[in-house]
């Protein structure tokens, strides 16, 4: 029997997030970004014969190998991601993303950069050349949670037939336009709903969902302040 599991949660932008676990990022064998919790991660739930088990397009053996490599050499967990953004015209900007540092080396797996277009809709004086920045935040949040669910479901031998997210965020432009010091410029709240179809027991899906929330890098970024250093120079 397939179960449709649907839930949602508000992103608490000012509250305390998960701090009693240890979040780390990927290893050389995976070259992808994921999280490990010291109270029980992928290594604790591995099932298979060690011959390259794949579930949801995820090589579970490589996943477990990444975790074990990080346990043996914690420096492999240190990643640094980069982006370069240039103004095009009006509210239109173009971001290039390619290289990054991770697993102790500069990654060169991407032959060409990803190009992300950013703009505003006409009502905000843009030309719809791309989603605006705050919409991209919603996309990043859902993308990160997708990785967390799919990877951890594979490690727990939970089969996922379908997975989707719906997101909404509320902004009051009084903050962005400098019309009120009492209104924050960013999202006042975010609502996210997750719908997942799986034949796993509901309690297993709820346990997976709670774990992914605790270990999601982007959800942590949204819920908790991140130190940001800003510099500007004359070009």
Name the predicted role of every residue range.
Residues 10-13:
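Short hydrophobic targeting helices and cationic amphipathic motifs
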